[in-house]
């Protein structure tokens, strides 16, 4: 359990303190991918929530 908590903290730390990474712009040739790139940081959180939904579906066995 501690390892999972540590991993979450590391992910949040790197996300919160790398704001300059989010301010970078894609090259013009890839500008059409902007909506997808904006959504990409949220994808790991969706997998995290999916784990809880899955466990609820099997009654937290």
From Swiss-Prot:
It is found in: Plastid, Chloroplast thylakoid membrane. The chain crosses the membrane at residues 36-56. One of its GO terms (biological process) is photosynthesis. One of its GO terms (cellular component) is photosystem II reaction center. Residues 1-24 form a propeptide. InterPro entries: PSII_PsbK, PSII_PsbK_sf. Its main location: plastid. One of the components of the core complex of photosystem II (PSII). PSII is a light-driven water:plastoquinone oxidoreductase that uses light energy to abstract electrons from H(2)O, generating O(2) and a proton gradient subsequently used for ATP formation. It consists of a core antenna complex that captures photons, and an electron transfer chain that converts photonic excitation into a charge separation. PSII is composed of 1 copy each of membrane proteins PsbA, PsbB, PsbC, PsbD, PsbE, PsbF, PsbH, PsbI, PsbJ, PsbK, PsbL, PsbM, PsbT, PsbX, PsbY, PsbZ, Psb30/Ycf12, at least 3 peripheral proteins of the oxygen-evolving complex and a large number of cofactors. It forms dimeric complexes. This is Photosystem II reaction center protein K. It comes from Eucalyptus globulus subsp. globulus.
């Amino acid at each position: 359990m501690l390892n999972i908590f540590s991993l979450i903290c590391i992910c949040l730390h790197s996300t919160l303190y790398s704001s300059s990474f989010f301010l970078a712009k894609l090259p013009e040739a890839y500008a059409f991918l902007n909506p997808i790139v904006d959504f990409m940081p949220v994808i790991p959180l969706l997998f995290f929530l999916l784990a809880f939904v899955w466990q609820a579906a099997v009654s937290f066995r």
